[in-house]
Design a protein with these regions (language model features):
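Basic, helix-initiating cap at the start of DNA-binding domains
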Residues: 1-42, 55, 59-62, 67
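Hydrophobic alpha-helical connector segments
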Residues: 63, 77-103, 158-161
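N-terminal intrinsically disordered/low-complexity leader segments
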Residues: 1-13, 175, 195-204
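Amphipathic alpha-helical packing segments from all-alpha helical-bundle domains
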Residues: 70-73, 109, 118-148, 152-162
Length: 204
């Protein structure tokens, strides 16, 4: 008699448990040193179960990073929203994005240890990243601002933030980019002038 298919809830619970276990392993041992057997052991499942959910190790890493990015964007939006009015929402959104990313142990480690994988994931998931950043900006902006500048301008801003964030996180720099003040200065000198014309003429 064939074994019954697991329910969607069971599958979701299994995936969540695997992702939770992988995140702990990555935090404790680094991305390069963690094998699927380590994740399976911590999750309390077999290696075969992991392969039913993820084709290979890189796919598991990508799923962990995707989930953490979703949470990170939501945290950034909520933090800026609760901080109250800002002198420049563009600069603050950019600065906080960099700071929060660097504070996330696994995401920051991914940049340092697996830059090639980062670029591959960007090629695959960049559209989704823009959508997440645009959604975060709509939370951050004052009421009615996103509607005033229009959907395309919000998406353009999200794209520009991500491109300049990638520059700061992935490329070496001749100027210091360590402190919030350094990042705000960089954003003012380089990021703001690069914004689409539709945004430069409207202040958030």
């Amino acid at each position: 008699m064939p074994r019954p298919e697991p329910s969607p809830a069971t599958v979701a619970d299994s995936v969540t448990g695997i992702l939770d276990a992988a995140l702990v392993e990555f935090e404790r041992h680094g991305l390069r040193r963690v094998a699927l057997d380590d994740v399976a052991r911590r999750a309390g499942v077999s290696r075969t179960t992991i392969y039913r959910r993820f084709a290979n190790r890189d796919e598991l890493v990508a799923a962990v990073i995707e989930r953490e990015n979703v949470a990170l964007f939501a945290d950034i939006a909520n933090e800026l929203k609760s901080a109250g009015p800002q002198s420049n929402y563009y600069v603050e959104a950019f600065t906080l994005s960099i700071l929060r990313f660097r504070r996330h142990h696994v995401l920051n480690q991914l940049i340092a240890d697996e830059p090639a994988l980062v670029m591959e994931m960007l090629h695959t998931h960049y559209g989704a990243a823009i959508e997440r950043m645009a959604a975060a900006l709509k939370v951050i902006f004052p009421a009615g601002f996103a509607e005033r500048i229009g959907e395309q301008s919000v998406n353009d801003l999200a794209d520009t933030i991500l491109r300049y964030a990638g520059m700061v996180l992935l490329l070496p720099s001749v100027e210091p980019l360590d402190t919030p003040e350094d990042l705000r200065a960089f954003a003012t000198r380089h990021f703001l002038p690069s914004l689409p014309a539709s945004l430069r003429t409207v202040s958030a």
